[in-house]
Amino acid sequence: MKKIFLAVLATLGISSFAFAQENENGNFFTRDMEYQVKANFSIGGSTPLGIPREIRKITHYNPTLVLGLEADATKWVSNDKKWGIRVGIRTEGKGMKTEAVVKSYFTEVIQNDEKIKGYFTGTVETDIKNTYVTMPVSVVYKVSPRWKLYGGLYASILVDKNFSGYVSDGYLRQDTPIGTKVVFENGTKANYNFSNDLRLFQWGGQLGAEWHLNKHFILFPELNYGINGIFKSEFKSISFALHNIYLNLGFGYKF
């Protein structure tokens, strides 16, 4: 993965040098350029890779209303205008609500204004609602006058955050799987909030396609995968990593 990342950076560096040379001639922003704006909604979530053994059943999933808005520019670098480099900026939400039945699920909750850690068995509800400012950089290939494919990397900065929820209908063993038993029943809940443990910077990969309805309007699907986890490396209150994996569906306007 590191070699692939370095290869992409090297390719983009060579392209940037070529762009700079052309910019000296005053043609960079007018020659072989394409500009567009896009809007989308997203379906997905912050999820582990595979289902951990602690999660026995997902009883509810709500993707919520998650929207994004992007502006990007494509520079065609081949003479036939089939290959290009695209740079964009977008603001996007990533979120979901879930309910799951778990067993021996390591977590940290707040009870009577005190934090307690341990292994919980019962029901866990989670509410995630985060906003990012993202810069995607992609290689674009024009398959036909109506179809384009693209793929590349993105870097995101977290600007608004929420990762919270509660546990109920079960019990927690403090510190170890055989520790002191704390019971949550008859409507008793214990909250948790890991918002401040979310990673500020995230990066990942994206793959997408665009279909041109006409000269200006486009439809597109796009898959985003967060390569690094959503939590800081020192975060230990969940025993497995969570990654942002989302499918974006939307429309755009090409100028």
Residue ranges: model-predicted function:
Residues 26, 70-76, 138-140, 208-212, ...:
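Transmembrane beta-barrel domains of outer membrane proteins
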Residues 35, 65-71, 131-137, 203-207, ...:
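Hydrophobic, lipid-facing positions within transmembrane beta-strands of outer-membrane proteins
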Residues 211-217, 243-255:
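Outer-membrane beta-barrel "beta-signal"
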Residues 81-85, 146-149, 215-221:
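Repeated loop/turn-to-beta-strand initiation elements of outer-membrane beta-barrel proteins
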Residues 30, 74-80, 144, 214-216:
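Outer-membrane beta-barrel channels and translocator barrels
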Residues 45-64, 94-131, 158-200, 228-246:
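Extracellular/periplasm-exposed beta-strand and loop segments of Gram-negative cell-envelope proteins
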Residues 37-45, 87-93, 151-157, 221-225, ...:
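Transmembrane beta-barrel strands of outer-membrane/channel proteins
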Residues 1-32:
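Cleavable N-terminal export/targeting peptides
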